[in-house]
């Protein structure tokens, strides 16, 4: 499996057994100025997250694309 990974936002080969791609987003103190923090990566299962953290998981190559842009 290949997934996009931060910080480079480039497609990388996942380690053996990690067949899920994920996109995790959350806000910190700078969210209103910089936007949400984004983490892209691979996992064996869809990661569990705490309240306030959004996660999207998928299982095809490079399915976790995220459009990075300038905050408004």
Curated annotation (Swiss-Prot):
Subcellular location: Secreted
Claim: Secreted is one of the keywords in the record: yes
Disulphide bond pairs: 3-21, 14-42, 27-31, 46-57, 58-63
GO terms for cellular component: extracellular region
Keyword match Disulfide bond: yes
Major localisation: secreted
Domain of life: Eukaryota
Keywords: Acetylcholine receptor inhibiting toxin, Disulfide bond, Ion channel impairing toxin, Neurotoxin, Postsynaptic neurotoxin, Secreted, Toxin
One Pfam family recorded for the sequence: Toxin_cobra-type
Annotated GO MF terms: acetylcholine receptor inhibitor activity; ion channel regulator activity; toxin activity
Expression (tissue specificity): Expressed by the venom gland.
Gene3D superfamilies: CD59
Family: Belongs to the three-finger toxin family. Long-chain subfamily. Type II alpha-neurotoxin sub-subfamily.
Function: Binds with high affinity to muscular (alpha-1/CHRNA1) and neuronal (alpha-7/CHRNA7) nicotinic acetylcholine receptor (nAChR) and inhibits acetylcholine from binding to the receptor, thereby impairing neuromuscular and neuronal transmission.
Descriptive protein name: Alpha-elapitoxin-Dpp2c
Source species of the chain: Dendroaspis polylepis polylepis
